[in-house]
Structure formats: structure tokens, C-alpha cells
Amino acid sequence: IGQAQALRERLAALPLTAVVTSPLDRTVQTTRLMLGDRDVPVHLDERVGECRYGDWTGRPLKELAKDPLWRVVQAHPSSVVFPGADGESMPQMQHRAVSAIREWNDRLGPDAIYAVVSHGDIIKSVLADALGMHLDQFQRLHVDPCSVSVVQYTSMRPFVERTNDVGGDLSRLAPSPKKKSRRRTSDAVVGGGAGA
């Protein structure tokens, strides 16, 4: 609860257009605590819901770590299909989550600032996609509860602006007043700076 309330303070400077959240109770609760009394539309979207772990759902991590599939999940997640009728593959999980976020980005528009409240594997898989990493490398990413990761999507490519930020100032993410600018032929700045 304290983490979500701290996140509320950090997000206060951002004009959120919407919040898209996994429908699981814990993410809905985090969303409510994160927003407090802000009047921001909240959208439940199963596509950013937890990985469908099938028969693994609800089992303790100590027990799962002894399952031979655990090593595969850690080393080669792209080949994992979770057992059971409702288990999914990790590539399916990544595809549905990335597709959902890209669809929300298109729906809300290029200037929208919105939050997606989701789960560790979902967030890591979206970050891996945005970084151009193979899914087998996504376990190299770390995502803490109530951390902030920021991906800016442009017509050419995504830009990863932050990962696993647990205390930094987020005010820089707020849009600055529009300035008259030259038309750029690319969305990336030579030299990696903010450009002129």
C-alpha cells in the first residue's frame, strides 16, 4: 500500500490521460491507491493481465523452482508453454501485451501520457520488445513492485526512457509547452541528446 501511495505522489505532476490495468484484484487495488482522488479514466484490459501460468498458478515459488520447466523459463522462455488447459506460451504472453499497448497508444494518440498497471513478466516482455531484445533475454530485466518503466512509441520505433525507476523525479516526463520547430526526418536525435 505504501509503495502505491508513494507512486501517487511521483505521478502527480503528470497529466495522465488514462490508466490501463490488468483486471486482477491486486492491480486494480494498486491503480486505485495510485490515483487517489484523481479523475482519470481506468480501463481494465485482460491483455495486460498476468501470464497464464496454467497448472503453475497459485503454486509456491519454492515448489516451482524444483520443476524442470523452471530452468527453461529462466534460460529459454521463448520455448516455454505452461502446462494445463489454460496455460499459454511466453511468446503468446508477450505478443498480447505488446499488441495491447500499441493499440492503446494508437487509440489515445501520440501526445497522451497514460499508465499501464501490470505484472513483472508482462512489463519485462514489453520492455524487451521495445529494446529489440529476444524474449530469451528478458530475464535480464528487473521490475520492482510499483516501479516506473517508460516507453515512448513513435511512428518509427519505441524509445525506452526509464526502467524500474523506484524513486526518481518524474516531472521531466510531463509535456513542455509546444515550440515552433523544424520538421525532423527522424525521431532520434544525432548524438543522443534532446536536440535543438
Q: What residue spans do the PLM features occupy?
A:
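Active-site-proximal alpha-helix that buttresses catalytic centers in soluble enzyme cores
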Residues: 1-39, 44, 67
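Generic structural signal for well-ordered alpha-helical scaffold segments
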Residues: 5-12, 94, 98-106, 127
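Short beta-strand scaffold positions
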Residues: 21-22, 95, 117-118
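Active-site signature of alpha/beta-hydrolase-fold catalytic machinery across serine-
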Residues: 33, 125, 129
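Phosphate-handling substructures
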Residues: 36-99, 152, 162-163, 174-178, ...
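Acidic, low-complexity terminal tails and accessory targeting/binding regions
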Residues: 51-62, 106, 110-112, 129-196
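Generic beta-sheet signal
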Residues: 112-121
